[in-house]
Amino acid sequence: IGWRNVYMVFGLIVIFVLIPTVRYFVIDTPEEIGQHKDNLPDQSSLDSSQDLMEIKDFFKHGIFWIISLAFAFQFLAMGGVLLHLPLHSENQGFLETWTILGFPIKQTVFAYSFAAFGGVVGKVFFGYLMDRLNPNIPVMIMMAMQSIGIFGLTLIDNYLVFTIFCFVFGLGFGGAMVLMSACFLKAFGSQNLGSVRGVSALLIVPVQPIGMVLVGTAFDLNLYLESFLLMGAITPVSYTHLTLPTNSNV
């Protein structure tokens, strides 16, 4: 049905399925359904340790800059590769079309979808790890998987292995949104989470499109493989100095 109609279908799903679901099923706080933050029965000490901060105060804390810039470069690398993944698949010669249940599926589209499926799994997987490990560890695993996935899908010309690396790439970037919010939650507490996430966008959003422009320009210059490798190298650099506090006090 073409890319444009596919996006139209996505838009209709958001309007008629996701928005009503959010309206009736998403809660504001765990207490609404008889649960507790971080599964702690005694919330008094937890809540008293979290002071509501002024927006300008976020910029005074080094951990705010570290988390924001680490994920800014992670999104930079992810966006540059993900946007151009179908074109890269075609350049690798993955042009075959399969028929499944009467629907034609191109190899390029399947690989792209497999990366997206990895993204869904990554959200659940890294959310699980974040509850059970020091927050630094899931973030490092996530970014390492994104980097490994990028290097693999760039260098491999076997389609089966290529799709596996696409999935690994998806696992990595899929956990990014979950882990970024979790990192800010660990550092600044639940009372400041909404504000700090919004302020961090001032740093993250301007950086994110750079990867897309860089890789797109590299495609025009027939240097996109080098740009993919650069995206793979940027990802691990972004978490080199990411060290989070072990409690919600900054």
Predicted regions and their residues:
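Interfacial helix-cap and linker-helix signal at transmembrane-aqueous boundaries
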Residues: 1, 89-90, 129-130, 215-222
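C-terminal ends and interior cores of transmembrane alpha-helices
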Residues: 146-157
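A late C-terminal transmembrane helix in Major Facilitator Superfamily
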Residues: 192-219
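Helix-loop-helix hairpin linking two adjacent transmembrane segments in secondary transporters
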Residues: 1-29
